């Protein structure tokens, strides 16, 4: 059973041209996760891991029908980046970003909640439906489909399970 992501989820990687975003995109594509593109301002038209890169989230959603985002952008840009994600109509945002001030996290969560976007993070390990979609920092080789799911507040502790 999948709750947050599955084989029908259309995922964008925000910050796809950065080192972390590129590594996630390559791993997700190789694992069969339904990634449809990425967003990095000023890099529209490029390809990363065979995926199209767009300049804005609205442009990416219009072109791909994406409904989920894995955000791998620098902490200094995360508030504006999340607002762009929410305003583009994304249903789920996974914020794989550390060192976000508490007040920024509170603002982002309130903004997203008021507009119907679910957030995992900041500092989230992500979301996985084994064998269907993996938008997390968890290795597919260690995951199996089944009846049991795990939710963790701590990405680091999730690795121990």
Tell me the role of every PLM-derived stretch.
Residues 1-161:
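Catalytic-core regions of core metabolic enzymes
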